[in-house]
Swiss-Prot record:
Heterodimer of a 70 kDa and a 82 kDa subunit. Part of the early transcription complex composed of ETF, RAP94, and the DNA-directed RNA polymerase. It comes from the Viruses. Belongs to the helicase family. VETF subfamily. Residues 32-185 form the Helicase ATP-binding domain. Keywords: Activator, ATP-binding, DNA-binding, Helicase, Hydrolase, Nucleotide-binding, Transcription, Transcription regulation, Virion. One of its GO terms (cellular component) is virion component. Its EC number is 3.6.4.-. Residues 326-505 form the Helicase C-terminal domain. It comes from Rabbit fibroma virus (strain Kasza) (RFV). ATP binds at H45, I46, M47, G48, S49, G50, K51, T52. GO terms for molecular function: ATP binding; DNA binding; helicase activity; hydrolase activity. SUPFAM superfamilies: P-loop containing nucleoside triphosphate hydrolases. The keyword Lipid metabolism does not apply. This is Early transcription factor 70 kDa subunit.
Length: 635
């Protein structure tokens, strides 16, 4: 990161269309490392810091010299990247070749490079002299996409820009995949780790620390946004190590079936069934590993007050909630909470069924769907919920537009957004006041990503109000242990703890090693002080001009303040004056604090900001869908 670029911007205004100083400073680093030196880079910027914008800025710069291929996890994130590209282009003050930039989802990229599940090696030559940008890079390995990237890297000898806010998904071993794409070094991971009996006991040894530093030095950009301009976080529940957890003590009904299912699980840390019964129990259905049975049973009695019929749950138990200590707590608590809720859960088939019918039975209506029993209201309208899973048919983007809209700041359009893992990456939520974990996440990175969807800069108008976080754990009816240290229990004792508590302890064990490695990556992150790279000078100058004219509506053409600002990059006075003339003659777009969206104009001996507004007459499109032609008419 070029610290000299950051120092160009004091009191940077962030509430207008802009490029943040750290994004420009990182762009400088990427240009020097990837374009000039042909090195691969890991962009390890913590969630909410604008990695997508940095990646697209770099893609536009690089497009002048090479083809750029951008891979994203799925079609929904592809849409986000395409939208963000339009935003970035509007702020980009330099030449680019858009035809040299290709954005693919991993599945579509797979389809064009494989024939009958075999890599089409003859087609890989198209990636010669290219640059690859991979979003959420930690997720592409262990599948065909990871294999393909390794082949392309070895055959084509091209650089990669890997984006990740959490490069270690589970254990240090996952870092080996990222290293393999970033260097030509062959690493025997058995030489650099200490392997215990459990997954969380995989540690990086001292030799591993040195290997990590030697291979990745000069290839890491680490950045974490300052926590200013963020609301405080209020964790609820019982003290648990360095956080708080809400203990949800089971009823006798839930506890009985919970124990029966637990006896069936040989390795319960990877058993969906334990996640299921920790969320809610459904009688005999919990003893069957095939969830399709849920939607085939007809008028089957699960408990005296709960039945299922063709995938529909009904009965008084959905209100008394002896089947779920977590939902009993949740339903009782939300009655008195204000604002929007974001609720994470796993196992979308089972969880989605439970959530839908508990919410409907307790008076909450489905967004664009069924109305709740005796509907609860806000401003005279039903309080609604939406469930997001990978199987949802409606557009996720449309749903999020409504959820994030100004009209929904109070939750009057959609109050409760339930989501499985699909929402853990790349999406931004706004004005969320209550975050719930109905399932304990599998990894530390997943936990942080879920929090990071909501608690981020520019997502809250009022940062004086805290965000409530509820991490729910299903526990036995008599369990009330206070856990202060990871050493409070032996491994044998941990195995007897409630599933959620055991999972939390494993998560904390893994977190300890993850944090140690992250601190190593942070320590070798590259920073320097140099004038802006020639390839990004115009982009930096554009941001300097935007910042200047936010504060000034009208100045003399020879204004020394503007000249000084431009000369901070263009040290030659004549070059600076020429640049100022060019942006005025070209009617550079700025956002002024008085006039808002404006264009620069020369008026006599002054430079003025002239507000503008795009408008059009009402019109109607008439389209003939015959194959031969379309007719467009306007009255």
């Amino acid at each position: 990161m070029n610290l000299a670029v950051i120092r160009l911007f004091k009191h940077h205004v962030n509430n207008i269309p802009n490029i943040l100083p750290h994004q420009l400073a990182t762009l400088d680093y990427l240009v020097r490392s990837i374009i000039d030196e042909n090195k691969s880079v890991l962009l390890f910027h913590i969630m909410g810091s604008g990695k997508t914008i940095i990646a697209l800025l770099f893609a536009l710069v690089a497009s002048r010299f090479k083809k750029v291929y951008i891979l994203v996890p799925n079609i929904n994130i592809l849409k986000i990247f395409n939208y963000s590209m339009d935003v970035v282009i509007n702020l980009f003050n330099a030449d680019y070749i858009l035809e040299n930039i290709f954005i693919y989802s991993t599945t579509s990229f797979y389809s064009i490079n494989y024939n009958d599940n075999v890599i089409n090696y003859n087609g890989l030559s198209r990636y010669n002299n290219a640059i690859f940008i991979i979003d959420e890079a930690h997720n592409i390995f262990g599948n065909n996409t990871g294999e393909l990237m390794t082949v392309i890297k070895n055959r084509n000898k091209i650089p990669f820009l890997l984006l990740s806010g959490s490069p270690i998904t589970n254990t240090p071993i996952t870092l080996s995949n990222i290293i393999s794409l970033m260097s030509d070094e062959e690493i025997n991971f058995s030489d650099i780790i200490i392997q215990g009996k459990k997954v969380f006991q995989i540690l990086l040894n001292e030799h591993g620390v040195n290997v990590l530093k030697n291979i990745l030095k000069g290839r890491i950009s680490y950045y974490e946004m300052p926590d200013t301009d963020l609301p405080g976080i209020q964790y609820h529940g019982k003290s648990f190590l360095d956080t708080r957890v809400v203990y949800c003590n089971m009823s006798k009904l839930q506890e009985k079936d919970y124990i029966n299912v637990r006896k069936m699980c040989n390795n319960e840390m990877f058993e969906k069934n334990m996640n299921n019964v920790s969320l809610a129990v459904l009688g005999q259905l919990n003893l069957i590993n095939n969830l399709d049975i849920l939607f085939q049973e007809q008028d089957k009695e699960l408990y005296p007050n709960l039945k299922i019929n063709n995938g529909v749950l009904y009965g008084e138990e959905l209100v008394t909630l002896n089947i779920s200590s977590k939902f009993k707590y949740f339903i009782n608590k939300i009655e008195n909470l204000k604002g929007k809720h974001f609720i994470y859960f796993s196992n979308s088939t089972y969880g989605g069924l439970i959530i839908k019918y508990i919410m409907l039975s307790n008076g909450y209506s489905e967004y664009n769907g069924s109305q709740g029993t005796y509907p609860k209201l806000i401003h005279g309208k039903p309080k609604t919920f939406a469930i997001v899973t990978s199987k949802m048919k409606a557009s996720l983007e449309d749903l999020l537009v409504t959820y994030n809209s100004l009209a929904n700041d109070d939750g009057s359009q959609i109050m409760f957004l339930f989501s499985s893992n699909i929402m853990s990456e790349s999406y931004t939520l706004k004005e969320v006041r209550n975050i719930w974990f109905m399932t304990i996440p599998d990894t530390f990175s997943q936990y942080n990503q879920i929090l990071g969807r909501s608690i981020r800069k520019f997502s809250y108008k009022d940062i004086t109000q805290p965000v409530n976080v509820y991490l729910l754990a299903t526990v036995y009816s008599d369990f009330n242990d206070t856990i202060e240290s990871l050493d409070d229990y032996s491994l044998e004792e941990i195995n007897t703890l409630p599933f959620d508590i055991k999972k939390l302890l494993y998560l904390k064990f893994k977190t300890k090693e993850t944090n140690r490695i992250y601190s190593i990556l942070e320590s070798i992150s590259d920073s320097y002080t140099q004038p802006p790279h020639p390839h990004i000078v115009e982009i930096v100058l554009g941001e300097i001009v935007r910042q200047f004219f936010y504060h000034h509506s009208r100045i003399k053409q020879n204004d020394e303040r503007l000249l000084t600002a431009v000369k901070s990059v263009l040290t030659n006075t004549e070059a600076a004056k020429k640049y100022i003339k060019e942006i005025v003659d070209g009617h550079f777009f700025v956002s002024n604090k008085v006039f808002d969206k404006s264009l620069l104009y020369a008026y006599k001996d002054e430079i003025i900001t002239v507000p503008f507004k795009l408008s059009h007459e009402p019109f109607v499109w008439g389209v003939n869908f015959r194959k031969e032609y379309n007719v467009v008419s306007s009255p």
